[in-house]
Amino acid sequence: MSHVYAYGQQCPKAAGIIHLGATSCYVGDNTDIIVMRQGLELVRKKLIGVLAKLAKFAEEYKDMPCMAYTHCQPAQPTTVGKRATLWANELVMDLNEIDHRLATLQLRGVKGTTGTQASFMELFKGDADKIRAVDASIAKEMGFDPKAVVPVSGQTYSRKVDAFILNALAGIGQSCMKFATDLRLLANFKEMEEPFEKNQIGSSAMPYKRNPMRCERICALARYLMVDVLNPSFTTGTQWFERTLDDSANKRVAMAEGFLATDAILNIMLNVTDGLVVYPKVVRSRLMAELPFTVSY
């Protein structure tokens, strides 16, 4: 409001229309959509990087037989590379979801105080085509397709958009948690492990340990991310009529931390997938120990 007042002092004739029907949501909601699009693009780039590393690993170890597990019990042989494709496939599904969110993301545009565009109808003397032209112009200026503006809104864009986006991010968390959990189990079997730095020690009391701390951190952050989905879900369900302000504080925390958690997870994934360690002799030993039982039927 202080800015509007200051501009009005400098431009008295425009004081009555300089903020006509804009509301803080005109600035805030459109900005949020732009920022989330940029965030999704950054997530997409890192996700593709992780997939490239997993694809390389899968190709390298596609012919190395190992034991597959169902119910965490020895089942039938598979290969180390084939198992890696399970991890990669779920991340591809996440990439497709991110792409869908980017392709369908729309700006709020100019909708006025309650979504009726009444103030803009007044400004343009009832010329609806001019309002549509303003919406298209804003979308184009912000790097969106001129038609990528929500058709209807209240004071805010639908908070289902936030729920959709955070669900897509949580999907990445799910996939990364599955990968990290598998790797933690394989580290216990001593078949595979995450990279272990030159000067890294297991713990102050037990320096000989090889704790899978990166994968543990992935799981911890992923758990937070998956629970964070509840926030925009409840916000959407409790958005009274054209809007309530109790969405604001929650949204600012939930969406920002959801993106930050996803970014942190993918950073760790890039590190882990770049240096996966396989112990072929242990892999073969465990396979051979179980193989007689798998061919006995």
What annotation goes with each model-predicted range?
Residues 1-118, 124-141, 202-203, 213-217, ...:
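A helix-coil-helix interface module used to build multimeric assemblies
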Residues 3, 39, 43-50, 80-87, ...:
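Amphipathic alpha-helix face/heptad-repeat signature
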Residues 8, 48-51, 55, 92-95, ...:
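Structural signal for well-ordered, non-membrane alpha-helices
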Residues 13-15, 22-23, 75, 105, ...:
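Residue-level signal for pocket-adjacent positions within structured domains
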Residues 29, 72, 156, 242-243:
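Short, charged/polar, low-complexity loop and linker segments
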Residues 60-63, 97-100, 104, 140, ...:
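Conserved helix-loop functional segments at active or binding sites
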Residues 126-229:
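Acidic, glycine-rich loop-and-beta core segments that form the ion-binding/anion-interacting portion
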Residues 190-191, 203-297:
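Glycine-rich cofactor/substrate-binding loops
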